[in-house]
Amino acid sequence: MKQGIHPEYHTDAVVKCACGNSFTTGSVKEELKVEICSKCHPFFTGKQKIVDVGGRVEKFNKRFNLDTK
């Protein structure tokens, strides 16, 4: 590798979330600010909402005048 062209790597970079959670990781920046982390994201907290996509087949059949019975 060429000398002097690579950014300095910090093994103890602090990641701060908008919810107040913070943890360390490796990065070329000393501090990272994020809006969502594993402590506040709905997927990880179990408060995830299932999006109902029901009715798509019926809508398709209605659009093309198909009778599935």
Curated annotation (Swiss-Prot):
Recorded family membership: Belongs to the bacterial ribosomal protein bL31 family. Type A subfamily.
Gene Ontology biological-process annotations: translation
Role summary: Binds the 23S rRNA.
Domain of life from the UniProt record: Bacteria
Lineage of origin: Bacteria, Bacillati, Bacillota, Clostridia, Eubacteriales
Organism: Clostridium botulinum (strain Eklund 17B / Type B)
UniProt key word Nucleotidyltransferase: no
Binding site for Zn(2+): C17, C19, C37, C40
One Pfam entry name: Ribosomal_L31
Known partners and oligomeric status: Part of the 50S ribosomal subunit.
Protein name: Large ribosomal subunit protein bL31
Cofactor: Zn(2+)
Disulphide bonds in the chain: none
